[in-house]
Amino acid sequence: MNETPRVRKPASERRAEIMQAADAEFAANGLAGTRIEAIAARVGVSHPRIVQMFGSKRSLFMEVMHATFDRIEAVFAEAEPTLVGLGDAYRRLLRSERTVGLVMLQAYAAAADEAVREEARRRQLDLQESIARLTGADGLQVRTFFATGLVMTVSDLLELPEQRADAAWSAWILERAAPPDGD
C-alpha cells in the first residue's frame, strides 16, 4: 500500500490553521459547545496536538477572542478617526468577516467563566479607550457608540429586514453615536 507521506508544516503555519478552524467552531458553537476534536478534524491534526500548542480549550478560545479584538482594533486604526468612520469600518468588518460578530457574542455568552470574563472585560475597556483616543469622544459618546455597535452586530447577524432593506436605518444608528456638531 502506497500512502502519501504527510508533509510537516512549520509550527506557525499549523498554528494559523488551528486558529482559523477554532474561529469558525467557536463562532458557531461557543466555548461550551465546541469540541477540540472538531477543530482538530478541520485541520487534520490530533486533539493532543492542539492541547500541546494551546494548553486548553479555554486558552484557545481566549486566543480566538483576542484575535477578534485585534481585528477590530486594526480596522479602527485605519478608519477615519470619527465615531461615524469607526462605525462604518466596523460594519464593513462585520459583513466581510462574519465570525467577528459571532465570536464577540460568544465571548459575552461565556462570561460566566471568570477567566474569560476578565479577559473580555480588559479587552473591552482597552477598545473603549482606543475609541476615545482616536475620536476624542467623551465617556457617554463611547458608551453610546458601543451600544450602537452591539445593535449593529445583532442586527447584522440576525439579518433583520430593516437592516438589510433600509440603508438609512444604519446611517441613523451611526448618527446616534456621532458627537453633536460643534463639539
Enumerate the language-model features and the residues they cover.
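Actinobacteria-biased recognition of intrinsically disordered, low-complexity terminal regions
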Residues: 1-13, 174-183
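Short, amphipathic alpha-helix enriched in basic
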Residues: 1-5, 12-38
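The short coil/loop that forms the "turn" connecting the two helices of the helix-turn-helix
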Residues: 13-14, 45, 56
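Alpha-helical structural segments
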Residues: 17-24, 28, 42, 52, ...
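Key DNA-contact positions within bacterial/archaeal DNA-binding proteins
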Residues: 48
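Residue-level recognition of oxygen-bearing side chains
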Residues: 56-59, 99
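Helical hydrophobic small-molecule/effector-binding pocket
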Residues: 75, 83-105, 110-118
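Hydrophobic/aromatic-rich alpha-helical bundle segments in the mid-to-C-terminal region
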Residues: 113-125, 131-183
